[in-house]
């Protein structure tokens, strides 16, 4: 079915009508268009064969004549089982800003904008129907729909259904399946990382090893335990973890009860050579009075203080880093939690990092997103920040307005939180690298702030984690295996079938549209209905905050990472979209119960496949990477930890041009690609020059051969001419005459070879020539012997055959042969005897 088109040719956008409204005192509106009375209620099949559709992606609802308010583009909106797809009206190209995966949507609202009518207008202008979609990837999108249709309602209902799957199996990734991006068992990769940390990289894990329980390797200090192979010890811990070799499994069973959710202290990274470790756990259950103790927990923690190498009996220091603010740790004591006391733990020191909880991070993220939308070039109200509040904020507005705009970013607190995470991780890395101390990190549950700190510290300490393979190993170990609740934090359904969703379907509360698509003087906005993807209040961008922190380190050390900021952006987009199964559910146990590894595609395999076609020239590769220079720990000083907005992620929707300009790697890569193309063109030109040179040499050699053959031919012709002349004179001296005749021309005594060269040439080329020698008549020789002799022998005669004697001297005058007549019959009468030839 052909989508309906307005008679005017192009669907006019909201900005067109808002400008007309200003010119005509509010008389213009979308109603000026004669819309076709066709309301698409479901997928009609006209877009089922789009090349942009992914595997197993199908169109559910279509909306025609939709306007993307952010960029004032008209097009077609499609809701599929994977995403909202916005296609430009003319070319049907995908508009990236208007295209967003369903799982990436944080919330969406139906908005109604009431436009005031002009006094000169008799008809009432219908309200403009808008749909605002807020993404988890820092963008706010607003779509404008045609009036007097049910398109917005159909799209809204489809989003309610598709963004609220009842079970995790209803996600698109299960419909797509593993495809060509199969997922190897993550347990094998986790064991391989443990083997590397233990110094046994030559051993490779296998499923047979896991099934037989033959993976419990060890070195002098640490060992791998299989106590949690059935997840009976701790449901949110991996099936295997590293602990001190001196601690038995029986002691672990007793010690785990003293930690929240049984997340006992285990090793997440150990430094080769020195024996220093970074350990992680949840908070201890010390109680309100902070007087509860566990001897086995204290013994386990003390085992991290192994003996220093080269020191006689001296053991290393232990730092216990509590990621929470001190007051929060004390408040947790009222619920049975709390923090350790340095007097109870051997050679330890307690440090509080003061990082806020998930709720503060969620609020901060929302504020910085609103700031970017309000002051970006592609705002959700369709206007630039230059025209905010009806005036030129930067060009001629008042100074207080400018200051207020700038302060909004600081008020969001996002950069302050990033700095807290960076400072904490840098402090941990410095203690391990400079003091060879061990550090135990925990927060409340040990899966949010703890994971941020230990993984970022490992990234600073171990250069392996700054490669593609190492980054994957780090994320799978510290984030996935140790149970960061991705389902809760990203806002996805979990294994129990109840996701973190709360959709009030009939909430008709009036509200203020954060960024009105037209000037507030032209009308008012109201929220008719809204939806949210984190009703249970567990949604929080914890992992995104960590990725942001990694990008800050890449800004400080641009040559220390194999991957580029673009890789982090694409990696984050894949995670939020739920296109792959790696980050589904809340723990390793839940992913195993769902069969994620077998049923879904692998994000890592997909990213590796993208790079396989371009090798080091791919946008995911860092062109400045120098592994030889940065082969040790990175220890940034405190002054360098001041963060900035991450342009490639934060600004890509609000300020796309500025985001591209900020990526030096992209510019360098473009120059590299251009240089590579020019190098290829140069090589092709050089090959062409070589071919032409070879051809010229061949032609020159051929020309030399031809010249040689020509010279030989000329010499042969000259020699033949001389021989012919000599033979002619000899024959004529005997009184004979040479005649040339052909088979088709009668003999002509006047056509001798020397007297008619043109005929000679014709005979030589076109006729069969016969040569005859005849005797000259006697009367011709007896009458004028001198003339005969001169005619035959004298080289001084003229071309006409006239003798030039006596003007010139003649060697033949007076010769004894003048007038000599040859008698050939006498030769026949000669008697020749054989005895003449006998030897004497």
Swiss-Prot record:
Q: What induces it?
A: Accumulates upon dehydration.
Q: What class of enzyme is it?
A: hydrolase
Q: Which domain of life is it from?
A: Eukaryota
Region (Disordered) location: 1-28, 506-535, 745-771
Q: Which family does it belong to?
A: Belongs to the protein-tyrosine phosphatase family. Non-receptor class myotubularin subfamily.
Role noted for this protein: Phosphatase with phosphoinositide 3'-phosphatase activity that can use phosphatidylinositol-3-phosphate (PtdIns3P) and phosphatidylinositol-3,5-diphosphate (PtdIns3,5P(2)) as substrates and produces phosphatidylinositol-5-phosphate (PtdIns5P); participates in pathway(s) that transfer gene regulatory signals to the nucleus. Required for recovery after water deprivation, via the accumulation of PtdIns5P upon dehydration; high PtdIns5P levels mediate ATX1 cytoplasmic localization, thus down-regulating the expression of ATX1-dependent genes. Confers sensitivity to soil-water-deficit stress.
This protein is called Phosphatidylinositol-3-phosphatase myotubularin-1
UniProt source species: Arabidopsis thaliana
Q: What lineage does UniProt assign to this protein's organism?
A: Eukaryota, Viridiplantae, Streptophyta, Embryophyta, Tracheophyta
Q: Which gene encodes it?
A: MTM1
